C-alpha cells in the first residue's frame, strides 16, 4: 500500500519536507521514505526550512532540532504560532532524547517526537498516522466552511 496516497484527498501526493543539516541523516530518511508515494523537499538549516515551507507547502515536516541559523525548536514555534502554517504536522527527528528536550519540543508545538537512530518501520507508521490526521483535519475544515456557508 502506498501510504501517502492512501492518506491524501483525491489521491494527491503528500508533501514531506526533511529539515536536517546532516547529509547522511537526510539520505537515510529519504531512503526510508522511498516506498511512500510523496513529494520530498530538503532544507539544510532553520531559515531554509521556513523558506521551503512558504514555497513547498508541506503536509509534514521531519524536523531536526540541532540546525544552524534557527534551531528546530525555534522553527517549530514560528510555524505553530502562524495561523497560515499551524496546521502543518511536525515530527521532530533528533538525537536529543532527554526528558527536557522532549518537553521543549512539546512546548514549541511539535506533533510528535522520534529519537535517532530512526527505525524505518516506526518512522513509516508515524508518517502514515500524521498524514492521515493532517488530511482528516483538512477535510473537517473544508466541511466546516461548507456548512457555515449554508447557514449564511
Region roles according to the model:
Residues 1-17, 30, 142-152:
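Non-catalytic signal-transmission and effector/linker regions of two-component phosphorelay proteins
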Residues 56-62:
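Active-site beta3 strand of CheY-like receiver
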Residues 23-44:
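Two-component/phosphorelay signaling modules centered on CheY-like receiver
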Residues 100, 118-127, 131:
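C-terminal output helix
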Residues 67, 90:
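Receiver (REC) domain active-site loop signature in two-component systems and cognate sites
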Amino acid at each position: 500500500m502506498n501510504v501517502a496516497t492512501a492518506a491524501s484527498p483525491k489521491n494527491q501526493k503528500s508533501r514531506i519536507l526533511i529539515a536536517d543539516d546532516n547529509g547522511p541523516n537526510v539520505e537515510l530518511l529519504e531512503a526510508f521514505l522511498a516506498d511512500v508515494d510523496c513529494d520530498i523537499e530538503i532544507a539544510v538549516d532553520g531559515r531554509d526550512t521556513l523558506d521551503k515551507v512558504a514555497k513547498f507547502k508541506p503536509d509534514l515536516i521531519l524536523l531536526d532540532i540541532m540546525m544552524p541559523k534557527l534551531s528546530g525548536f525555534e522553527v517549530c514555534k514560528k510555524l505553530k504560532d502562524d495561523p497560515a502554517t499551524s496546521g502543518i504536522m511536525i515530527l521532530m527527528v533528533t538525537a536529543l532524547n532527554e526528558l527536557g528536550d522532549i518537553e521543549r519540543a512539546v512546548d514549541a508545538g511539535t506533533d510528535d517526537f522520534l529519537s535517532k537512530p530512526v527505525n524505518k518501520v516506526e518512522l513509516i507508521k508515524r508518517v502514515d498516522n500524521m498524514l492521515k490526521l493532517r488530511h482528516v483535519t483538512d477535510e473537517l475544515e473544508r466541511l466546516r466552511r461548507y456548512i457555515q456557508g449554508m447557514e449564511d
